[in-house]
Amino acid sequence: MRFPLFHSRNGLRFYLLRGIALSILLVLAVFAGNVWQVYRTGNQTLPAAATADAAVVLGAAAWNKQPSPVFLERINHAIALYQSHRVGKIVFTGGTPKKGYMTEAEVGRRYALKQGIPAKNILFENTSRNTYENLRNIKPILRANSVDSIIIVSDPYHFARAQAIARDLDLNAEVSATPTTRFDAREKKGRFLFQESYLLFLYQFESWGDRIWDWITRNG
């Protein structure tokens, strides 16, 4: 069977342009879906009766051995969950961008100890550099300490990506947003929403690529 359109320059150009247009539309549709997912997930609230073995505080910047305002909000929220007996432990995550500086996890732990949280109820990993590593690196620590369920603590728009990662890592996770956030201003909120939608898209693209490659290597 012959396909005349493919045997002319105009026919080939038509199919090429149509393929590019469809690809762009697909990317835009996925991105729009991500924006909605990030927004919807960011407006979810933790059920009043929800409890877990531990609260996991996703890392954020630390300055001169002190938590940044964003990190402080996350730490205080995890402490509130602990003090209200909704979690039994607090897990801090996060490394350092520069050698010689105190890690985010160590800054969080230090602050929590000063607030009266017993050292035996604080766990941490201090080598991660991003959200995926935060959650991946705590997995063996959770297992070693018989922690079967967690509540992830972060800013609202961070949760769509955090949930996707937790799901891929087979973590039994709920999410709980900080009651206040430094991203409340409309401009900052919009920027954070766009940024997280973009990062979720990149994570999905990489995750789908890995799955396709795994399928090819298994069946090739």
Predicted regions located by residue number:
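A transmembrane-helix-recognition feature enriched in membrane-embedded lipid enzymes
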Residues: W36, R186-I216
